[in-house]
Amino acid sequence: MENSKVMKDIEVANLLEEVQEDELNEVLGAKKKSGVIPTVSHDCHMNSFQFVFTCCS
């Protein structure tokens, strides 16, 4: 069991090495203006999304 977890961690680390910094910034939204994500209704700050997804954990 422990060995399979180590192998999985190594796989994930190898996948992250293949991602370029620019690609990562685009996926995470770091290139957006000041952390604001435009939506249909209004601009939501990333902190709002983080609160919604982590408030009940």
Swiss-Prot record:
InterPro entries: Lantibiotic_typ-A_Lactobact. Maturation of lantibiotics involves the enzymatic conversion of Thr, and Ser into dehydrated AA and the formation of thioether bonds with cysteine. This is followed by membrane translocation and cleavage of the modified precursor. GO terms for biological process: defense response to bacterium; killing of cells of another organism. Pfam families: L_biotic_typeA (PF04604). The keyword Lyase does not apply. GO terms for molecular function: signaling receptor binding. It is found in: Secreted. GO terms for cellular component: extracellular region. The modification 2,3-didehydrobutyrine is found at T54. Transmembrane segments: none annotated. There is a cross-link at S41-C55, S48-C56 (Lanthionine (Ser-Cys)). There is a cross-link at T39-C44 (Beta-methyllanthionine (Thr-Cys)). Its main location: secreted. Lanthionine-containing peptide antibiotic (lantibiotic) active on Gram-positive bacteria, such as Lactobacillus sakei, Leuconostoc mesenteroides and Pediococcus pentosaceus. The bactericidal activity of lantibiotics is based on depolarization of energized bacterial cytoplasmic membranes, initiated by the formation of aqueous transmembrane pores. NCBIfam families: HEC_x9_TCC_lant (NF040664). This is Lantibiotic nukacin.
